[in-house]
Amino acid sequence: MKKVLLVTFSDNADHQDTLFGMYEEMRKMKKWDVYLLCIKTPKVGLQQSDHTWLVDCPERPGVTQKTFNLPLLFSVIHRIRKEHFDAIYFESLHTWNLPIMMMAGKAKTYQVIHEVIPHEGDSQVKMVDLMNKAVVKFADMIVLRNKTYIQDLIDRYDISADRVKYLELWRRYPEYTAAVHNGRVLFFGRINPYKGVDNLLEIVRLCPDIKFDVIGRVDSQMQEVVGQLAKEKNVKLNNDYVTDEEMRDAFVNCDWVIVPYNSASQSGIIVDAYKYSRPVIAFAVGAIPEQVDVDKSGYLVEAGDNKKFAEKLKEAMSVDKDEYDTISRYAYQYGSKKYATSGAVERFVKLLENGDRK
């Protein structure tokens, strides 16, 4: 039996859900003995056992006081080396990934890069680029969640093509969630410059008869735009931290999820929308076109055309209940086939087995 360690030190619920779901699926398998290493206080549910290692590590990839807790770091590395893993898979960037990779012994290491080209305006852009360069140097394999940026990764970081692997996003998937038909539209996620909140403001003003729920913590650079959003009568704004249950309620209690981004690698929000049977409308930026079955699971709009986006949203909101229910069910089925952890486990194991043969 081969042994694999799944690692995320992120406090991001998406990264946790991704890895925890894979851990649970692989626990059902006889061929792989799976372990999980994550932060001490995860935000999402986890089936804990003697194979789940929860540590009080720094929760962000940047440098903090906890980064230099060397006794804890070395104890983690010692524990890893003692288990003689065949593979170690890192779902998110983190400063501790690097020493673990360097001292992993014979284990094959896999690192996911979510942002090949860090988003302009993001406060962490320099750190992300630096971390990308470092993990490309030390990891055996680099994993991308989309096909669009494979060549960009190869060119930007001077990495050989045989070290780059594509693996679709995945999430734990619930049962189908019936439509509520309440005429609400959801914009969800941390409000950063690249998320297109400037676009959202114009779209909101072009659609005065549509009700918008805008939920997400606000980047300091976006306070002014969000302040203007808050004044719009058709906007309900929530900038507080939301729990898993509150997130679920947000998606369930809307008809459409909108993604008016200025740039994107891929969107976890689209995966979450499908998870709760909600179709999407998005700008065709980055790798987002890989995620939308056009006119079936949702709609794509030419990047930056807010007027066209507003027109498409009005059109979507005007469909009758039967037509919407058909779109909603298709979005769920499309997303489940493409993104459910239960289906992704075979692709993930194949990645590990192919890497082991090299």
Model-derived segments and spans:
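Donor nucleotide-sugar binding/catalytic pocket of nucleotide-sugar-dependent glycosyltransferases
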Residues: 137-175
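Nucleotide-activated donor-binding/catalytic signature segment of Leloir-type glycosyltransferases, i.e.
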Residues: 224-248
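Acidic donor-binding loop of glycosyltransferase active sites
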Residues: 250-266, 278
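Conserved acidic donor-binding segment of nucleotide-sugar-dependent glycosyltransferases
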Residues: 294-295, 299-307, 315-321
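A short, well-ordered alpha-helix in the C-terminal region of glycosyltransferases
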Residues: 322-338
